[in-house]
């Protein structure tokens, strides 16, 4: 699975979808033009919310052939990697703060033949990633405190994104994908791309207005990248 870095990719976060018709939501967001399906897995312990497990991921896999980007916001993620791989994950991202042996877990994910990602919370320094970049395919920067959708981006995290992009360049790891999650909208999309984001996770800004707006909302995000007048000042 190869993700082209020439243009930013939009990952639709189903955390903001209607869970009562989740399969249909995945199908609709696929047709609307999302590049990636972003799936937040929460355990109610590492983050203050509970979402879905591997059985649900497996049940929606047939509704889309797009990349399934599974973000494990759970303690001891290594215990669940196999289950989510078998459920159809194409990318599995673990939190650096939630795993005592992140390098081992990342190596295990890569050995399954899928992409391995590592994520850090807003309070975690980007320097903590320096030793781990050799072992991951993707870095996910949380622009908000994880657990709930609909939050506003924490401005300092955009500088962190820029710093991580520079760190990746310094280490000559330019194939590593940079993903951002939290408060992504038409007003900050372009600035986040300029700061280094390859994949931008969007939930509320896609789903909130209902199915009829999915395609338009995704197009608006893409078009905002081409305009400079909509940039937020972080």
Can you describe what each PLM-predicted range is?
Residues 1-16, 23-24, 229-234:
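N-terminal amphipathic alpha-helix/helix-capping segment at the start of soluble metabolic enzymes
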Residues 8-13, 37-39, 60, 68-72, ...:
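Hydrophobic faces of well-ordered beta-strands that scaffold small-molecule active sites
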Residues 26, 78-86, 124-136, 182-200:
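Catalytic cores of alpha/beta
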Residues 109, 193, 207-234:
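C-terminal helical cap(s) of enzyme catalytic domains, especially alpha/beta-barrels
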């Amino acid at each position: 699975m190869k993700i082209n870095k020439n243009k930013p990719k939009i990952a639709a976060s189903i955390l903001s979808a209607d869970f009562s018709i989740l399969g249909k939501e995945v199908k609709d967001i696929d047709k609307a033009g999302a590049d990636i399906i972003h799936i937040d897995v929460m355990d109610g312990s590492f983050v203050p919310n509970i979402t879905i497990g591997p059985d649900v991921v497996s049940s929606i896999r047939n509704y889309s052939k797009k990349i399934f980007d599974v973000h494990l916001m759970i303690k001891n993620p290594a215990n669940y990697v196999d289950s989510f791989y078998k459920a159809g994950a194409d990318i599995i991202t673990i939190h650096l703060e939630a795993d005592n042996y992140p390098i081992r877990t990342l190596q295990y994910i890569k050995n399954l033949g899928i992409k391995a990602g590592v994520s850090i919370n807003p309070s975690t320094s980007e320097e903590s990633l320096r030793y781990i970049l050799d072992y991951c395919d993707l870095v996910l920067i949380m622009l908000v405190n994880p657990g709930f959708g609909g939050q506003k981006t924490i401005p300092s995290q955009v500088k962190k994104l820029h710093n991580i992009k520079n760190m990746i360049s310094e280490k000559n790891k330019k194939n590593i994908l940079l993903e951002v999650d939290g408060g992504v909208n038409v007003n900050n999309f372009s600035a986040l791309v300029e700061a280094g984001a390859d994949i931008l996770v969007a939930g509320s800004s896609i789903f909130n207005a209902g199915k009829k707006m999915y395609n338009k909302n995704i197009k608006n995000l893409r078009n905002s990248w081409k305009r400079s007048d909509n940039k937020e000042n972080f």
